[in-house]
Design a protein with these regions (language model features):
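Glycan-recognition and catalytic cores of secretory/periplasmic carbohydrate-active enzymes
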Residues: 1-393
Length: 393
């Protein structure tokens, strides 16, 4: 395992984070460029996304916490100050969805998912440095979500609202999503930052929110027949249940496990551990003989998206290492190592740094999608490296 940890440290330092420092830092307008395309061309005037910047903040904060390299603290602080100065809505609370390349508000809607990632980033910076300002911002954003996005009547969190926290017609995270007022993805990326915030701010109100989120996963989001997580719902939690997303399933399996472990309630942990093993088994339907995991299965028409997306492989590796660590099942270690071998061979860009977005069904590299951008950040892959460095397995 020491060899695997050494490899992860090398990839993190010399393939991922150095790319973001050397290639993506925006020296002219501050923060980081909004886009580097699939051919490694920088687009200096691209809009800058909240999710990307919050994830950069998280990645460098976590890397500094674990590896203590001053250049990671410098990059984390750069991201912290940029998000604080340009994305935080000083008037209405929350954060903007995007700003232009000069840092002026562009899309001012309040996407709960993005606010969740800001909490993830600021709480990790506070965890890594003890910085009170970052912690205060994370707590304030938590209160914004609870005040405006939590639906006490139906339970759960509203997908998106206007800048002033009013209803909004188009709630979608991206063009690929259904326009549902409740999504699994947003709930996953609220429980994840709430768990991280709980590490540095253990309060009864936050614990109550986390326990409720675990109940939402087990009672509403989990498909009791297939053990996949269903993705899109309306206010009353009615959904089509027609998509199986293998990457989200395996990501949820280890994130929910992490939440139960951090909470420290043995009864909750026992319940969650029973469920997450079933979710992981369902996710394994996406595994392919080459060691990779495909993206999605649309049950209407029995169609598969066979792209091997970078983030799905990362979550597949962490999820199976988590299962091996806690349940000592050798086949899970084998799944993780085979997937890593696939990633090292196909997705890592050995020449230019960072990872390609995906390998297409025909085995070619997807260069249409970004190397760095609105949805491509040093989050999934740096987290995979850090999880494998930090864990005892």
């Amino acid at each position: 395992m020491e060899n695997l940890k050494k490899t992860m440290k090398d990839v993190l330092e010399n393939n991922i984070l150095n790319y973001w420092i050397d290639k993506v830092k925006d020296e002219e307008n501050g923060g980081f460029y909004g886009r580097v395309d699939g051919n490694d061309q920088v687009h200096p005037e691209a809009e800058k996304g909240a999710v990307m910047n919050a994830r950069i903040l998280w990645a460098f904060s976590a890397a500094y916490r674990v590896l203590k390299k001053p250049e990671y603290l410098e990059a984390a602080t750069r991201a912290k100050e940029y998000v604080r100065d340009h994305f935080l809505d000083k008037e209405y609370g929350g954060i903007y969805w995007s700003v232009d390349y000069k840092g002026n508000p562009l899309d001012t809607k309040k996407q709960t998912y993005a606010i969740g990632f800001a909490i993830y980033g600021f709480s990790e910076y506070a965890r890594a440095t003890g910085d009170q300002e970052a912690l205060d911002i994370a707590i304030s954003l938590y209160h914004d979500i609870e005040k405006y996005a939590f639906d006490a009547k139906n339970n759960g969190y509203i997908e998106a609202l206007t800048r002033e926290w009013q209803p909004i017609a188009d709630m979608r995270l991206s063009d690929k999503d259904e326009n549902g007022s409740r999504t699994m993805n947003t709930h996953l990326h609220i429980i994840e930052p709430y768990t991280n915030l709980y590490r540095v701010w253990k309060t009864e109100e936050l614990e109550k929110s986390i326990r409720n989120l675990l109940d939402i996963f087990t009672d509403k989001l989990l498909n009791q027949e297939t053990y996949h997580l269903d993705l899109f719902f309306n206010d009353e939690w009615e959904g089509k249940r027609n998509i199986e997303s293998y990457g989200h399933d395996i990501e949820a399996s280890w994130l929910l496990h992490e939440t139960a472990l951090v909470l420290g309630d043995k009864e909750v942990l026992h319940k969650i551990e029973r469920i997450i093993r079933r979710i992981a088994d369902a996710a394994d339907e996406g595994l392919r003989p080459d060691g990779s995991m495909v993206y999605e299965h649309w049950k209407d028409g029995d169609q598969f998206d066979l792209q091997r997306q970078w983030w799905v492989q990362c979550e597949n590796i962490i999820g199976h290492i988590d299962l091996y660590q806690y349940f000592r099942t050798d086949e899970n270690l084998e799944v993780a190592i085979r997937c890593w071998n696939y990633v090292a061979k196909h997705l890592l860009d050995q020449q230019n740094g960072e990872w390609h977005w995906a390998i297409l069904e025909d085995g070619t590299v997807n260069k249409e999608d970004d190397k760095a951008g609105f949805w491509k950040c040093p989050y999934h892959n740096s987290r995979m490296c850090l999880e494998l460095i930090e864990r005892e397995y």
